[in-house]
Amino acid sequence: MERNQRKTLVGRVVSDKMDKTITVVVETKRNHPVYGKRINYSKKYKAHDENNVAKEGDIVRIMETRPLSATKHFRLVEVVEEAVII
């Protein structure tokens, strides 16, 4: 499989407490199968952050990769938007 055909997701970093690992929550909208109402779904993914550049609250792009651990199957591609510190 070519690298550009791998699944890429955009989400928000909710945890950066682990070394070289971030937790990213990806939010999607889907229609309810019976009622047709738009419903928000969210799913958490663990991603590899080699240089520990992503911080909590950042918007990041992650890409599917080979399994790096029991729960880590994504890696950080880029930080799309840094978190605003108030």
UniProtKB/Swiss-Prot annotation:
It holds the Pfam family Ribosomal_S17. It comes from the Bacteria. One of its GO terms (cellular component) is cytosolic small ribosomal subunit. Keywords: Ribonucleoprotein, Ribosomal protein, RNA-binding, rRNA-binding. The keyword Cytoplasm does not apply. One of its GO terms (biological process) is translation. One of its GO terms (molecular function) is structural constituent of ribosome. Part of the 30S ribosomal subunit. Belongs to the universal ribosomal protein uS17 family. One of the primary rRNA binding proteins, it binds specifically to the 5'-end of 16S ribosomal RNA. This is Small ribosomal subunit protein uS17. The lineage of its organism: Bacteria, Bacillati, Bacillota, Bacilli, Lactobacillales.
